[in-house]
């Protein structure tokens, strides 16, 4: 099982435009080398403004590596030349490193029509 750093935290969401994406290989496993322009940042946490000021308006290179089983994550499908996507910008305070992650999207739907008026009141809906 892969070991992941435990100290990364999301400090902002960045809007990017994919400028290039090239499949490759590292250690016999597939990779995707990407280059994207960081257009803007939103939901910037207090204290991260300076880091984001250095990133917004720049071109970034980011390589997506496969997992231990040799499979690339599903997020590679979004990295198509010309695509505009949102990524979580994460920072590790222990070593000063940054990384990008695709925001998790909750696929669940909230159908309040199944709730009684009392249940809606309890849930604040």
Predicted regions and their residues:
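OB-fold ssDNA-binding interfaces and closely related basic DNA-contact patches used
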Residues: 1-56
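A structural detector for beta-sheet-dominated domains
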Residues: 17-19, 37-39, 65, 88-90, ...
């Amino acid at each position: 099982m892969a070991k992941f750093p435990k100290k990364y935290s999301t400090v902002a969401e960045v809007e990017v435009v994919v400028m290039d994406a090239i499949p490759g290989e590292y250690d016999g496993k597939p990779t995707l080398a990407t280059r994207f322009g960081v257009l803007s940042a939103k939901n910037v946490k207090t204290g991260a403004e300076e880091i984001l000021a250095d990133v917004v308006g720049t071109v970034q290179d980011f390589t997506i590596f496969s997992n231990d089983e040799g499979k690339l994550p599903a997020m590679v499908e979004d990295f198509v030349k010309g695509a505009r996507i949102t990524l979580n910008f994460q920072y590790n305070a222990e070593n000063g490193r940054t990384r990008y992650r695709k925001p998790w999207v909750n696929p669940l739907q909230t159908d309040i029509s199944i709730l009684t008026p009392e249940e809606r009141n309890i849930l604040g809906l």
